[in-house]
Each structure stands twice: as C-alpha cells, then as structure tokens.
C-alpha cells in the first residue's frame, strides 16, 4: 500500500551517488532498509558520532553482538580494508546494521506503539554511497557527509568569492562560527579533529586578526595562541575539540 519515487544522481566530477527519495508510507509492523553489500573485509566498521567516530565490530561472534540489531550513526558509516573503502551517507537516518562487509541503512519503520499511525505519511530524504581507494584517513567521507547534509546556499547579488576561514587540513573541521555572547564583537570558532589523527594546523582567518585565545564553553579566555599573518596556529589531538575566541583589529 506504500509507494515511492527516487531520483538517483551522480554529479560530474563527484564520486558520490545520491538517492533523493520520497515515500508515501502506509505500513504496519514493517521495517524498510536499503542494503549495500560489499566485498570489503574490515574487522571494524566506522560510524560517525558527534565530533568524531566510533569503530564497531563487523561480525557477531559475541552474544551481545548477536542481539544488537543495529547501531547509531550520524552523517556516515564506512567499511575499509586499508586499501579500499565504501561509505553510506545520509541526511536524517540514524540506524544502521553492519555485518560481513554489508552496510544496511534503516529508512522507515512501522511500529504499532505508542501510535499505530505515527509514520504513515509522506517522507522525503536523501542518502548516498561513495567509494575510494586508500585508507579512511585518506578519504573525503567526512566532507561528503557535510555536503549531503548542508548543501550550499545560493544568494543573488554577490559576485566575488570569500572564505571566512580555512583550516588548510582535510581532518580539521570548523563546526560553528558565532559572535561572542558578551557583545564585544569577538568571533567564536568551534573546531574539531575528525579522523583520529594528531597534527598541527594553521587556521587562516580572512579578517584582520588582533589576537586569539583558547576558551571554555562559556567563552572565557584560557590560553592565548599564536597568530602569524592572520593564521591561528594550533595543535590537535585525535578527536580533540577546541573553542577559539578571535579578537579583530
């Protein structure tokens, strides 16, 4: 009794296949999943979580793993054998099963409790698939996960290009930028390391920077950091989160 329409697209120059999906869902006691079987052997699968990822077994040899129907993921889940990798991306579907190289994303369910009609309506969502050569750290999966969730905005009237900041690294992510709560006009940047690596990076701020500090969650200054030619120099541990306060000239 359900129907769906799906546009499958592969953009020029991209390695990501997107599945833009609309489903008119009218089911009971049903679960809809999409399966991507692969021939990759990876002992552990990778599931994104906030500010990083967690590795979980791709097998069910232990009792608690056999009872685990699916696990949580955010923007992506991936399997990699060291030389090749495959990832499933999504914009709003957070349950996934992983076993023997297969990634199975849960799209819809039709439970009876507490509301038998809870999901009986039209659903619109997008998921994607991407493959690459090399290790997970060499891939652009994190970037593609952001692209499928935060598409660029098109604004009329602006002809020049401008980037507020650039990390100069494929594994340091600027998660948020805001004005300081104290009304000083300072900028607050939230950054994190996304690929379980240790590195030093120079975050280029394309505004006149006077000084920069590491700060706490309440935006209180804790430690001044070096600024060279408008670039803020910082060291990151694996999955480290940093909040930086930028004072402009």
Residue ranges: model-predicted function:
Residues 1-249:
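C-terminal (or distal) subdomains of carbohydrate-active enzymes
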């Amino acid at each position: 009794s359900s129907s769906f329409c799906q546009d499958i697209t592969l953009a020029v120059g991209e390695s990501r296949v997107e599945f833009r999906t609309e489903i008119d869902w009218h089911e009971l006691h049903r679960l809809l999943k999409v399966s991507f079987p692969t021939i990759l052997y990876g002992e552990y699968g990778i599931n994104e979580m906030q500010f990083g990822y967690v590795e979980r077994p791709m097998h069910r040899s232990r009792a608690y793993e056999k009872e685990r129907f699916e696990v949580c993921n955010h923007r992506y889940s991936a399997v990699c054998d060291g030389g090749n990798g495959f990832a499933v991306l999504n914009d709003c579907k957070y349950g996934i099963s992983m076993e023997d190289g297969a990634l199975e994303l849960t799209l819809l369910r039709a439970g009876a409790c507490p509301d038998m009609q809870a999901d009986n309506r039209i659903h619109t969502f997008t998921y994607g698939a991407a493959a690459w050569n090399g290790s997970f750290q060499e891939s652009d999966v994190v970037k593609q996960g952001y692209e499928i969730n935060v598409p660029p905005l098109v604004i009329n009237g602006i002809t020049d290009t401008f980037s507020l900041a650039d990390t100069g690294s494929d594994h340091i992510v600027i998660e948020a930028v805001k004005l300081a709560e104290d009304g000083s006009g300072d900028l607050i940047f939230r950054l994190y390391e996304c690929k379980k690596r240790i590195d030093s990076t120079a975050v280029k701020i394309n505004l006149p920077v006077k000084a920069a500090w590491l700060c706490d969650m309440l935006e209180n200054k804790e430690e001044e950091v070096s600024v060279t030619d408008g670039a803020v120099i910082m060291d990151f541990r694996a999955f480290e989160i940093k909040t930086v306060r930028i004072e402009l000239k």
